[in-house]
Regions:
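Ribokinase/PfkB-type carbohydrate-kinase core domain
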Residues: 2-21, 82-96, 108-229
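Glycine-rich phosphate/adenosyl-contacting loop at the front of the ribokinase-like
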Residues: 1-70, 75-79
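Short acidic/glycine-enriched loop/turn segments that link adjacent beta-strands
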Residues: 99-102
Length: 229
């Protein structure tokens, strides 16, 4: 793998994502076929998914944005890199030369729930040293998404959390966790290290309830207030 290093000579506070980025391929079908069936999809539309949306939103607000996750080498990775370039997002993470980035096929039939088929790629195949070279600078915001907490790359996130320590006042950057709906699948060890890091938790109501249940915290629904969710 190759690493890209951050220049810190004249640093401007940035949003840094440790999350995974992949390509979503949206397929609209009349009905999701049963096993052995057949369906015709209208207007297939590839787009960038995962933590890309957070980076894109921050960039549109005029904030420098950096992706510290892994990108691969191939068709999908090229699509991601081009989207980064078009949206002012800098990739500072590892480059995996022997594997493409992954993709998700998303089947939508008009039903409330979509059907997902995932092909994991370079983004999911990190290890304990994936984020070793990342050194957040003063006033940076480091964003960790739930999609990075369940596969090989999670060991790298865990290493970063241990380096971040347990006292937010001792850090000169802000650590934000967006657990997504995968929080119920995160293993106990990882959840413990997330909690001990004392980050800012960015949750909707369902995610906040799941977190409370995982931690064994009492829930009084009448007193639960979730801003924006």
């Amino acid at each position: 793998m190759l690493n890209l290093k951050r220049g810190i000579g004249t640093h401007e506070p940035s949003v840094i994502s440790l999350g995974q980025v992949w390509v979503d391929i949206m397929l609209n079908v009349d009905k999701v076929p049963a096993q052995g069936g057949f369906a015709v999809a209208d207007h297939p539309k590839p787009s960038i998914g995962g933590s890309y949306r957070v980076l894109q939103a921050a960039s549109r607000m005029g904030v420098p944005t950096e992706h510290a996750g892994i990108l691969g080498n191939g068709l999908w990775a090229h699509f991601i890199r081009q989207s980064f370039q078009d949206n002012g997002i800098t990739h500072i993470g590892q480059d995996r030369l022997d594997e493409d980035s992954g993709f998700r096929v998303v089947l939508s039939s008009g039903a409330p729930q979509k059907t997902f088929i995932a092909s994991y790629g370079a983004e999911a195949h990190g290890d304990s040293d994936t984020f070793d070279t990342l050194e957040p600078q003063p006033k940076d915001v480091v964003h960790i998404s739930g999609n990075t907490l369940m596969d090989h790359t999670a060991t790298g996130v865990d290493g970063f959390l241990l380096k971040a320590g347990t006292d937010p006042a001792a850090r000169d950057y802000t650590l934000v966790i967006n657990p997504t709906n995968t929080l119920r699948l995160v293993n106990d060890h990882m959840l413990e290290d997330l909690v001990l890091a004392r980050p800012v938790w960015s949750c909707n109501r369902q995610e906040a309830m799941t977190l409370a249940e995982r931690l064994g915290a009492p829930i009084d629904d009448s007193k639960v207030t979730i801003g924006g969710g």
